[in-house]
């Protein structure tokens, strides 16, 4: 089973767009792709990451498990709604059920790597450990990103989860000294797999497909599937 968990150093750094871009690139490379967003919050304000991935990437194999109305961390959103978090076993079974020969499974978390997604404080990192998954980390280029990224990479390393690389979720067309410096420093922490333009999530499907095709190295993407 080939699983890549897509996480981020913070909320709002572009995980969903990064997930959609990788899914779109892989689809265009002839790889069968499934995208899983086990836990979705914020449905009452229209948050629907799987719908966004579908619109941008053209991938049709999309799977989720639980949806909470409030735009809060999953544990808080579940409590607010009077609902339970899923169990770790439910999440693992959901993801394992997507396995097919030659298929790439992308699993998008909620918030950062160590946000509780299931009961008993299970996190995306825990799922990655049990699935033998790689982790693709979506990052910012603003102040604070170097510490946030280093902490995320350290959290992966301590549990033996291999980092597939970094994706800059939003790169402005007119970067300043901070953004340029941080981009160079981030590339020294882990392989930089893609730099996505600011506003990519607002592109139509045709423009997004062209952007995604150019953003990632196809040879690297094809090595993900085994």
Swiss-Prot record:
<feature type="binding site">
    <location>
        <position position="49"/>
    </location>
    <ligand>
        <name>ATP</name>
    </ligand>
</feature>
<dbReference type="GO" id="GO:0004141">
    <property type="term" value="F:dethiobiotin synthase activity"/>
</dbReference>
<feature type="binding site">
    <location>
        <position position="49"/>
    </location>
    <ligand>
        <name>Mg(2+)</name>
    </ligand>
</feature>
<feature type="binding site">
    <location>
        <begin position="12"/>
        <end position="17"/>
    </location>
    <ligand>
        <name>ATP</name>
    </ligand>
</feature>
<feature type="binding site">
    <location>
        <begin position="197"/>
        <end position="199"/>
    </location>
    <ligand>
        <name>ATP</name>
    </ligand>
</feature>
<keyword id="KW-0547">Nucleotide-binding</keyword>
<feature type="binding site">
    <location>
        <begin position="108"/>
        <end position="111"/>
    </location>
    <ligand>
        <name>ATP</name>
    </ligand>
</feature>
<comment type="similarity">
    <text>Belongs to the dethiobiotin synthetase family.</text>
</comment>
<dbReference type="GO" id="GO:0009102">
    <property type="term" value="P:biotin biosynthetic process"/>
</dbReference>
<dbReference type="GO" id="GO:0005524">
    <property type="term" value="F:ATP binding"/>
</dbReference>
<comment type="subunit">
    <text>Homodimer.</text>
</comment>
<dbReference type="GO" id="GO:0005829">
    <property type="term" value="C:cytosol"/>
</dbReference>
<feature type="binding site">
    <location>
        <position position="108"/>
    </location>
    <ligand>
        <name>Mg(2+)</name>
    </ligand>
</feature>
<dbReference type="Pfam" id="PF13500">
    <property type="entry name" value="AAA_26"/>
</dbReference>
<dbReference type="InterPro" id="IPR004472">
    <property type="entry name" value="DTB_synth_BioD"/>
</dbReference>
<feature type="binding site">
    <location>
        <position position="41"/>
    </location>
    <ligand>
        <name>substrate</name>
    </ligand>
</feature>
<feature type="active site">
    <location>
        <position position="37"/>
    </location>
</feature>
<protein>
    <recommendedName>
        <fullName>ATP-dependent dethiobiotin synthetase BioD</fullName>
        <ecNumber>6.3.3.3</ecNumber>
    </recommendedName>
</protein>
<feature type="binding site">
    <location>
        <begin position="169"/>
        <end position="170"/>
    </location>
    <ligand>
        <name>ATP</name>
    </ligand>
</feature>
<feature type="binding site">
    <location>
        <position position="16"/>
    </location>
    <ligand>
        <name>Mg(2+)</name>
    </ligand>
</feature>
<dbReference type="InterPro" id="IPR027417">
    <property type="entry name" value="P-loop_NTPase"/>
</dbReference>
<keyword id="KW-0436">Ligase</keyword>
<dbReference type="GO" id="GO:0000287">
    <property type="term" value="F:magnesium ion binding"/>
</dbReference>
<comment type="function">
    <text>Catalyzes a mechanistically unusual reaction, the ATP-dependent insertion of CO2 between the N7 and N8 nitrogen atoms of 7,8-diaminopelargonic acid (DAPA, also called 7,8-diammoniononanoate) to form a ureido ring.</text>
</comment>
<keyword id="KW-0963">Cytoplasm</keyword>
<keyword id="KW-0067">ATP-binding</keyword>
<keyword id="KW-0460">Magnesium</keyword>
<keyword id="KW-0093">Biotin biosynthesis</keyword>
<comment type="pathway">
    <text>Cofactor biosynthesis; biotin biosynthesis; biotin from 7,8-diaminononanoate: step 1/2.</text>
</comment>
<keyword id="KW-0479">Metal-binding</keyword>
């Amino acid at each position: 089973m080939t699983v890549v968990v897509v996480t981020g150093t913070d909320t709002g750094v572009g995980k969903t767009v990064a997930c959609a871009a990788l899914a779109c690139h892989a689809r265009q490379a002839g790889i069968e792709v499934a995208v899983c967003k086990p836990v979705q919050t914020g449905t009452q304000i229209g948050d629907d990451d799987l719908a966004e991935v579908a619109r941008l990437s053209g991938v049709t194999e999309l799977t989720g498990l639980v949806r909470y109305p409030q735009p809060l961390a999953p544990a808080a959103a579940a409590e607010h709604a009077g609902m339970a978090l899923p169990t770790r076993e439910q999440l693992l079974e959901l993801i394992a059920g997507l396995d097919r020969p030659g298929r790439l499974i992308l699993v998008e978390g909620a918030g950062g790597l160590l946000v509780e997604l299931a009961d008993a404080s299970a996190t995306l990192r825990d799922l990655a450990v049990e699935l033998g998954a790689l982790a693709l980390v979506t990052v910012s280029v603003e102040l604070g990103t170097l510490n946030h990224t280093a902490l995320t990479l350290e959290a992966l390393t301590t549990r033996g989860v291999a980092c597939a690389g970094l994706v800059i979720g939003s790169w402005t067309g007119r970067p300043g000294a901070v953004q340029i410096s941080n981009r160079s420093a981030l590339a020294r922490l882990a392989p930089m797999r893609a730099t996505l333009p600011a506003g990519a999530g607002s592109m139509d499907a045709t423009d997004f497909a062209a952007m995604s095709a150019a953003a990632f190295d196809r040879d690297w993407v094809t090595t993900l599937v085994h």
